[in-house]
Structures are given as C-alpha cells and as structure tokens.
C-alpha cells in the first residue's frame, strides 16, 4: 500500500507510521474537497432548468419582493418588468418570488447542514476504516429534506 516501506533487514514490507499518517491526512483533505463538490452538485440539481441569468437574479427578485411587502412604494424595477412581460399580476409574482425564495432557503439549509454534519464526522475520524466508510456515505449522499 501507499504507506508500506520495504525493510531490507527483514526483507519484507512494513507499515511506516509517518507515511500512514501522511496518507490519512491527504485522504481526509481529498474527501473534504469531494464533500464540497458534492454539496455544489446537489445544489445545482435543485436549479436544473433555470438559466444562469435567472439564477443570478434570485437575490434581487427576493430583495425587491420583500421591500414591496414592507413598503408598497418601494422601487421594484425588475419584478415590474417580469410581471408585465410575463402577463401576471404584480402581487401574484411577488407572492411566487417569496414562496420560491423560502423553499430554496430551506433546501439550501438542509444541504449546508448535511454537508457540515459530514465534515464534523470527517474531522473526527481516527482510522482509515472510519474514513473509508464515511467516503462511501458521501458518495451515496443525495438531497433529502429532513
């Protein structure tokens, strides 16, 4: 394995504790990166079907909708145009934007919580066996609202 060295005296391979520790550290770091990528992939799955331009406007849409709910005189140039061009009442669009933003916030909260729980477990692993088992769980991780 990657952490064995050949011992010329005994003419056999022995575990190098230094190499084993380094291998374990590298594997943990790699799994931490894999975990971050997996979280991004799961988030991207939630956004499937939305063009990037629209995704980039989500924060602005929510900000305008919430401002209008709090003050009907608030400036809402983006939402006014979306409602006009889409042909839906402005108030209906505001409700939809707020509802979608809330749903998305909950979903992202679940993903973040799941990722952080995996990270906590990853940082606490002490053995290669624990690390391998956790790696399998991370590979199988899918979005589940709990």
Label every model-predicted segment.
Residues 1-146:
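A preference for well-ordered globular domain cores
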């Amino acid at each position: 394995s990657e952490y064995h060295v050949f011992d010329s005296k005994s003419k056999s391979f022995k575990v190098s504790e230094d190499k084993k520790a380094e291998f374990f550290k590298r594997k943990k770091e790699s799994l931490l990166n894999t975990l971050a990528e997996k979280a991004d992939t799961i988030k991207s799955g939630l956004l499937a079907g939305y063009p990037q331009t629209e995704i980039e406007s989500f924060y602005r849409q929510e900000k305008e909708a919430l401002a209008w709910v709090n003050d009907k005189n608030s400036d809402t140039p983006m939402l006014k145009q979306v409602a006009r061009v889409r042909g839906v009442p402005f108030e209906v669009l505001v409700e939809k934007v707020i509802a979608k933003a809330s749903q998305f916030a909950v979903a992202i909260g679940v993903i973040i919580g799941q990722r952080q729980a995996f990270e906590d477990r990853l940082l606490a692993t002490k053995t290669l066996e624990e690390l391998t088992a956790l790696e399998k769980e991370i590979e199988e991780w899918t979005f589940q609202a709990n």
